[in-house]
Design a protein with these regions (language model features):
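Short, polar/acidic, helix-capping and beta-turn segments at strand->helix junctions
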Residues: 1-125
Length: 125
């Protein structure tokens, strides 16, 4: 197993790695829409939060030698299912033609008042 840490995504805030690579698979820990450069925790629109979170996932995947086009499955936690339209539109734009398996999990609350958290599993290139 290899732990992945990159400055291009938010530093892990607890006892975990940003990702683990094992047997050619990258397991990305749940990511929030925190700006890795400034650690800014400003909550923007759901579209802004979704894009920032996906970019954090992407940065970790790249550090692991993978990318969004190698994602096998994503789990998206959203604080209000009514936000799904904005999440899905942004997700489709960022992911492009690649359509990995996906689960959407409505939850009551997420850290720091955010409305989205994304976890991913990807193949390494």
């Amino acid at each position: 197993m290899q732990a992945i840490e990159t400055r291009d995504a938010p530093t892990a805030a607890g006892h975990y790695s940003q990702a683990i690579v094992h047997n050619g698979v990258v397991y990305v820990a749940g990511q929030l829409p925190i700006d890795p450069k400034s650690s800014d925790r400003t909550v923007g629109s759901i579209e802004q939060q979704t894009e920032r979170t996906l970019r954090n996932v992407e940065a970790i995947l790249v550090a692991a030698g993978s990318g969004l086009d190698q994602v096998l499955q994503m789990t998206i936690y959203v604080s209000d299912i009514e936000l799904w339209g904005g999440v899905n539109t942004t997700y489709a734009r960022v992911m492009g033609a690649h359509r990995p398996a996906r689960a959407v999990v409505p939850v009551k609350d997420l850290h720091y008042g955010y409305q989205i958290e994304i976890q991913a599993i990807a193949a390494s290139k």
